[in-house]
Regions:
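Outer-membrane beta-barrel biogenesis signature
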Residues: 26-61, 68, 302-309
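Residues that define the transmembrane beta-barrel architecture of outer-membrane proteins
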Residues: 40, 72-76, 109-115, 129, ...
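Membrane-embedded beta-strand positions of outer-membrane beta-barrel proteins
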Residues: 44-46, 80, 92, 119, ...
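Transmembrane beta-strands of outer-membrane beta-barrel pores
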Residues: 48-54, 94-100, 123, 137-143, ...
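Repeated loop/turn-to-beta-strand initiation elements of outer-membrane beta-barrel proteins
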Residues: 54, 87-92, 126-131, 173-176, ...
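Outer membrane beta-barrel transmembrane domains
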Residues: 57-59, 64-66, 201-309
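Outer-membrane pore/translocation modules
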Residues: 105-207, 252, 267
Length: 309
């Protein structure tokens, strides 16, 4: 006989990492790749993402929850990448997210989540080998509820991220990329005067959300109008507690996940399309989600090129 359990959820440490885009010629890019827009060129992308799970890890115990059935998170995200120089790019994005379940009576949540901005700088580029320093931050743009999990669309914390990225690209188009990041996260305020975390009872509406870190490796091919890659990612919190037995999750939980995925893009000219699929293969305090995304990209010049004398 199957046991009915309280709800749980999985929220990605960086929701919009699932939504990515590239453009050929001067390829559009993300904060986790070595691709840059050229000076005075930009790329606007709009991506739809669908992520769902019906099993999750309560700490390290993999289980299901018949009270919510299948949990689904969907999002639409516009993103703009702008080339300031050939070695410096600015990226900005804000996703609109909605959550729902196939069972139970929990009210689904929807709204704009967090506005994110990134600076990406290439400080070394020699014989196909390059090093990149990347800094980013995010801030909530709406007053969504952070502790109504698994239905919350985010954690309501401000973040600051530092990342180092290494890339090697062969003249054949084959490339390898690896990066590591550390994510600082602010405290949040919840609409209650007391809560339980770390096996303690806190008489406060201020919650300390643990910092996080991530790492990834990618192997792909990029040449002319075609890009394809396979990747593996790992993300975790730097501390935090666990989902208590038969209890709801909370923003203080130490969420960990190992994800594998594939990505493909086709862009013969300035308009292109891309698609991505990813699956969480292992984790703790997260859902075993499968995610798909598809996007359309438009590359344009936002200023006239300098005239040659």
């Amino acid at each position: 006989m199957k046991k009915y359990l309280p709800l749980t959820r999985w929220t990605s440490l960086a929701c919009w990492f699932l939504l990515t885009f590239h453009v050929s010629q001067v390829f559009a890019q993300m904060p986790n790749d070595a691709i840059y827009m050229s000076k005075k060129t930009a790329c606007l992308a709009v991506t739809y993402s669908h992520s769902s799970w019906d099993k999750y890890w309560e700490n390290s115990l993999r289980r299901e929850n018949l009270n919510i059935g299948t949990h689904t998170t969907q999002s639409v995200m516009p993103m703009l990448a702008v080339g300031i120089t050939k070695n410096l790019n600015v990226i900005a994005a804000v996703p609109y997210i909605w959550t729902q379940t196939s069972a139970g009576n929990l009210m689904w949540q929807k709204g704009f989540q967090d506005a994110s901005g990134w600076l990406k700088y290439r400080f070394l580029n020699v014989s196909g080998f390059s090093l990149h320093a990347i800094a980013g931050g995010s801030i909530p743009v709406t007053n969504y509820i952070p502790d109504f999990l698994p239905m919350s669309i985010g954690l309501q914390c401000k973040t600051a991220t530092a990342r180092l990225l290494i890339n090697y690209r062969h003249k054949s188009g084959v490339y390898m990329t690896a990066h590591g990041s550390y994510i600082f996260r602010s405290n949040i305020k919840i609409d209650r005067d007391t809560y339980q975390a770390d096996e303690k009872l806190y008489d406060s509406d201020q919650v300390r959300v643990p910092n996080a870190y991530d790492a990834a490796a990618r192997l792909g091919y990029l040449k002319k109008a075609i890009q394809a890659e396979a990747y593996a990612e790992y993300g975790a919190c730097a501390g935090g507690d666990f989902i208590r037995r038969n209890d709801m999750p909370f923003p203080t939980n130490n969420m960990k996940s190992t994800t594998v995925g594939v990505y493909a893009k086709y862009q013969p000219k300035n308009i292109g399309v891309n698609a991505r699929a990813a699956h969480v293969v292992n984790g703790a305090n997260v859902g075993q989600s499968t995610a798909f995304s598809a996007g359309i990209l438009y590359q344009f010049r936002y200023a006239r090129a300098d005239k040659k004398l």
